[in-house]
């Protein structure tokens, strides 16, 4: 058996790969003009093919994904061509903004645990924040800013305590250390 033949590509496999590649390139070529397509390098074409595949996979999974820039341009030109037909139906459409992770973080309010008001405390229902930043400080009522509030100041752990002290635990059994002397010292 010849080792060179085992690793050689079969013409059938090469034909399948080139057929798949040409089909993928045809799908992507519709997003570009002929001049742009001819100017593009092979690596740029391949990256566009991969971007489109990823977009299709993410939309099939149900994620709301933004279109790649090259795909947006084609849709914009297509919609301009069909605007005359769709002008009367345009008012019925509702445009929904795409939700990104950063936008989602800004929308969702940060929930702080509320401590129930105790009888005899003068907090009068004002929730108390817990955590290392606030160290039990009372929050101001909404709408009123605290005069002692500083914008860029973060209070960390107290300076007197070591940061790892809460992680240490006591030994259950005492360890007794004995001093071991060298045998050479005993002989002298």
Curated annotation (Swiss-Prot):
Annotated signal peptide: none
Entry-linked Pfam families: SSXRD
Composition bias type Basic residues, residue spans: 157-170
UniProt keyword terms in alphabetical order: Phosphoprotein, Transcription, Transcription regulation
Membrane-spanning ranges: none
PTM annotation (Phosphoserine): residues: 123
PROSITE patterns: KRAB_RELATED (PS50806)
One GO biological process term: regulation of DNA-templated transcription
Ranges of biased composition (kind: Basic and acidic residues): 75-96, 112-122, 147-156
Domain of life: Eukaryota
Domain KRAB-related per the UniProt entry, residue ranges: 20-83
Tissue expression profile of the protein: Not detected in any normal tissues. Expressed in a melanoma cell line.
Biased composition (Acidic residues): 179-188
Record bears the keyword Ribonucleoprotein: no
Region (Disordered): 1-22, 74-188
Xref: InterPro entries: aKRAB (IPR003655), KRAB (IPR001909), KRAB_dom_sf (IPR036051), SSXRD_motif (IPR019041)
Coiled-coil regions listed: none
Protein's job: Could act as a modulator of transcription.
PANTHER family linked: PROTEIN SSX6-RELATED (PTHR14112:SF27), SYNOVIAL SARCOMA, X MEMBER (PTHR14112)
Entry similarity comment: Belongs to the SSX family.
Protein name: Putative protein SSX6
Gene of this entry: SSX6P
């Amino acid at each position: 058996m010849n080792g060179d033949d085992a690793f050689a590509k079969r013409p059938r496999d090469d034909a399948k790969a080139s057929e798949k590649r040409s089909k993928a390139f045809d799908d992507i070529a519709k997003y570009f003009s002929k001049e742009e397509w001819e100017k593009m390098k092979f690596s740029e074409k391949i990256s566009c093919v991969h971007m489109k595949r990823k977009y299709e996979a993410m939309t099939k999974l149900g994620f709301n994904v933004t279109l790649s820039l090259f795909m947006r341009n084609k849709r914009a030109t297509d919609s301009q061509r069909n605007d005359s037909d769709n002008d009367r139906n345009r008012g019925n459409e509702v445009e929904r903004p795409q939700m990104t992770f950063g936008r989602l973080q800004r929308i969702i309010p940060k929930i702080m645990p509320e401590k129930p008001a105790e009888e005899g405390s003068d907090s009068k229902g004002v929730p108390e924040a817990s955590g290392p930043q606030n160290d039990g400080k009372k929050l101001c009522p909404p709408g009123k800013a605290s005069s002692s509030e500083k914008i860029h100041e973060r209070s960390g752990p107290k300076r007197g305590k070591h940061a790892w002290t809460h992680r240490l635990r006591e030994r259950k059994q005492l360890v007794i250390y004995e001093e071991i002397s060298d045998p050479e010292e005993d002989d002298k």
